Regions:
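Polybasic, low-complexity RNA-engagement segments
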Residues: 1-49, 295-298, 305-394
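Mobile active-site "lid"/loop adjacent to the S-adenosyl-L-methionine
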Residues: 138, 174-216, 228, 232-240, ...
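S-adenosyl-L-methionine
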Residues: 135-170
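Conserved SAM-binding loop of SAM-dependent methyltransferases across substrates and taxa
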Residues: 113-126
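Conserved AdoMet
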Residues: 32-92
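Helix-to-beta-strand junctions that scaffold the AdoMet/dcAdoMet cofactor pocket
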Residues: 125, 221-223
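Conserved class I S-adenosyl-L-methionine
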Residues: 103-112
C-alpha cells in the first residue's frame, strides 16, 4: 500500500518522532474482534460457551479479540443467533462511552450497518426508545436486519438527513451518537481502497458535512443530554477543530472527561487556544494503531448544559410527545407535502386518518416493549420518505 505524499507529510507533522512506528504498524494485520450482545446473553453465560480463543479489548468488557487465526466468527451459529457482533476494536469505543440509562431516548445519527446501534439497544435493556438513522436506504436496510438479529426492541430505523429529523425531534433525545462520515484515514490499513477515496474526497470535503450533522444533533439533544462524536480519521480538521468550532458555536456544550483506558491518547491542543479550550480538547480520545490493538479512531463525549441543574424528563412512551407520536406526525407532514406538491386538488387521504388519531378515535400504535422489533413499515414508512422505504417490512 502506497500512502499519498500529502497524507504522509500530514502524519509526520501530527506524530513527530512516532511517525516511523506508525508506518511500521501499517504493515501489521488488523485485529478481528467480537462484541458480546448482552441483550441476548450475559458475559458470564458467554464465558461458559465461548468457542473461540480470545483476549479482552482494553476499553470495553464486552469486547474480545479473537486470537486463533483459524477461527471464523462470521461462520459460527452464535453469530447468526445474534449472540455477538463482529466489530473493529476501536469502533466499540463510541457506544461504550455514551451514558445510556433504561428508559432513555437515544439517537444514532449515522447508524448503518449497526455495530453501535445494536450496542445502544443492548444498553437500553428493552426499554426507552432507539432511533437508528442512516441517510442511505440500502445501508439502512442492512441496519434494520442487524437490529432484528440482535433482538432490539423499541427501535425504529429511519433513512433521513439529520436536518429532516431535526424537524420532528427538537430537544427530544437523552443521548445522541454521531459516528460521522469521514475521510477514513484510520482505516487505511484495514481497507486500502480508502486511500483512493481520501485522494478524491479528503478532510476538506467531509468537515463541512460533519459540522452540519453536529448542528442538527444539537437541536435534537435535550438540556442535560449527552452527545458522542466520533470518526475513524486522524485529521484534526475533522476531529478537534470540529469540536472547537462546535463549542464556540454552542457555548452551553462542554466536553466530559472519559475514563482513560489502555491505548487512549488525549486530544490535540494548540498554544493559541484559551486554557479552557485546551482543557476541553485534551479530554477527547484518540486511538493510534502503533499504540494499541485497534485502527485509528477519534471520540469525544459532550454534554448540553449542567446535568446537576437539569431535572430528568419522563421517558414514558405513553406521554403526549412520544416517539410514536412524533414519527406519525413527521410521516403525515411528509405525505401531505408530497400530495400538495403534486398539484392534486382532492383532499389528502391522510387527513381523515390524522383527525381520527388526534381525536382519540384511532389506535395510536405506540411503541410497545413486547414487540420483537419496532421497525415495521406499516407504522414507520411515512418517516422513511426515501425511495424504496417500503422494503423495510421485516
Amino acid at each position: 500500500m502506497t500512502l499519498p505524499k500529502k497524507y504522509q507529510q500530514a502524519m509526520q507533522d501530527l506524530l513527530g518522532e512516532e511517525y516511523s512506528a506508525y508506518i511500521e504498524s501499517m504493515q501489521q494485520r488488523s485485529q478481528t474482534a467480537i462484541r458480546i450482545n448482552t441483550a441476548k446473553i450475559s458475559l458470564e453465560q458467554w464465558a461458559e460457551i465461548c468457542p473461540f480463543k480470545t483476549k479482552p479489548v482494553p476499553w470495553t468488557e464486552k469486547g474480545f479479540l479473537t486470537t486463533d487465526e483459524q477461527c471464523n466468527p462470521a461462520k459460527h451459529p452464535y453469530y447468526y443467533a445474534g449472540l455477538y457482533y463482529i466489530q473493529e476494536p476501536s469502533a466499540m469505543i463510541p457506544a461504550s462511552i455514551l451514558p445510556v440509562h433504561e428508559g432513555d431516548r437515544i439517537l444514532d445519527v449515522c447508524a448503518a450497518p449497526g455495530g453501535k446501534a445494536t450496542e445502544l439497544a443492548a444498553k437500553l435493556r428493552g426499554t426507552g426508545q432507539l432511533v437508528a438513522n442512516d441517510i442511505s436506504v440500502s445501508r439502512a436496510m442492512a441496519l434494520a436486519k442487524n437490529l432484528q438479529i440482535a433482538g432490539a426492541v423499541n427501535a425504529v430505523v429511519t433513512a433521513e438527513k439529520p436536518e429532516r429529523l431535526q424537524e420532528s425531534f427538537s430537544q427530544y433525545f437523552d443521548g445522541i451518537l454521531i459516528d460521522a462520515p469521514c475521510s477514513g484515514e484510520g482505516m487505511f490499513r484495514r481497507d486500502p481502497h480508502m486511500v483512493q477515496d481520501w485522494e478524491e474526497k479528503g478532510p476538506q470535503y467531509y468537515a463541512p458535512i460533519q459540522r452540519d450533522i453536529l448542528k442538527a444533533a444539537y437541536q435534537m439533544l435535550r438540556e442535560g443530554g449527552y452527545l458522542v462524536y466520533s470518526t475513524c480519521t486522524f485529521s484534526p480538521e475533522e476531529d478537534e477543530k470540529n469540536i472547537l468550532w462546535f463549542l464556540r458555536q454552542f457555548p452551553d456544550m462542554h466536553v466530559c472527561e472519559v475514563p482513560r483506558k489502555e491505548g487512549f491518547c488525549s486530544g490535540i491542543t494548540d498554544a493559541a487556544l484559551t486554557e479552557t479550550e485546551r482543557q476541553q480538547l485534551s479530554r477527547c480520545v484518540r486511538i493510534f494503531p502503533h499504540k494499541t490493538v485497534g485502527e485509528g479512531h477519534f471520540a469525544v463525549l459532550l454534554q448540553k448544559g449542567d446535568s446537576s441543574a437539569v431535572e430528568q424528563e419522563s421517558n414514558s412512551v405513553e406521554q403526549e410527545n412520544s416517539l410514536a407520536e412524533r414519527v406519525h406526525d413527521h410521516g403525515f407532514r411528509m405525505a401531505e407535502k408530497k400530495h400538495q406538491s403534486s398539484g392534486a386538488g382532492r383532499r389528502s387521504k391522510y387527513d381523515g386518518t390524522r383527525q381520527q388519531r388526534l381525536s382519540g378515535k384511532k389506535d395510536r400504535r405506540r411503541m410497545d416493549g413486547d414487540n420483537d422489533l419496532a421497525v415495521k413499515a406499516t407504522w414507520w414508512t411515512g418517516c422513511l420518505s426515501a425511495p424504496g422505504a417500503e422494503r423495510y417490512r421485516l
